[in-house]
């Protein structure tokens, strides 16, 4: 019992990378994340895109930026991700 620590240990949080496709909302960006996988039977590489709404507290991400997202608690009805860092600014 003495092995308990006073600081709560965080669970593993999912991390995704994608491109900002919309920044028209206040403190929110829409990020398109591409998922590539091989078809189990035919072997073709398939690209699937998922769009996540992510929290951007400082409104610094713009359309075309490559960003890293991290999963967080639900911030609204559809927002469960937050922008951790901007990996590459749009040209």
From Swiss-Prot:
* Domain of life per record: Bacteria
UniProt record, GO biological process: translation
Gene Ontology terms for molecular function:
rRNA binding; structural constituent of ribosome
- What SUPFAM superfamilies does the annotation carry? Nucleic acid-binding proteins
Q: Which UniProt keywords apply?
A: Ribonucleoprotein, Ribosomal protein, RNA-binding, rRNA-binding
Q: Does the keyword Protein biosynthesis apply?
A: no
- InterPro entries per the UniProt record, alphabetical: NA-bd_OB-fold, Ribosomal_uS17, Ribosomal_uS17_bact/chlr, Ribosomal_uS17_CS
Role according to the record: One of the primary rRNA binding proteins, it binds specifically to the 5'-end of 16S ribosomal RNA.
**HAMAP family, per database record:** Ribosomal_uS17_B
This chain's protein is named Small ribosomal subunit protein uS17
Source organism (scientific name): Thermobifida fusca (strain YX)
Name the encoding gene, please. Answer: rpsQ
């Amino acid at each position: 019992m003495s092995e308990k620590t006073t600081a709560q240990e965080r669970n593993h949080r999912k991390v995704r990378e994608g491109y900002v496709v919309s920044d028209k909302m206040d403190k929110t960006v829409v990020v398109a994340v591409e998922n590539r996988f091989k078809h189990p039977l035919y072997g073709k590489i398939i690209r699937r895109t998922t769009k996540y709404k992510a929290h951007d507290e400082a409104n610094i991400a713009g359309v075309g930026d490559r960003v890293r997202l991290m999963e967080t608690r639900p911030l609204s009805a559809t927002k469960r991700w937050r922008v951790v860092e901007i990996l590459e600014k749009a040209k």
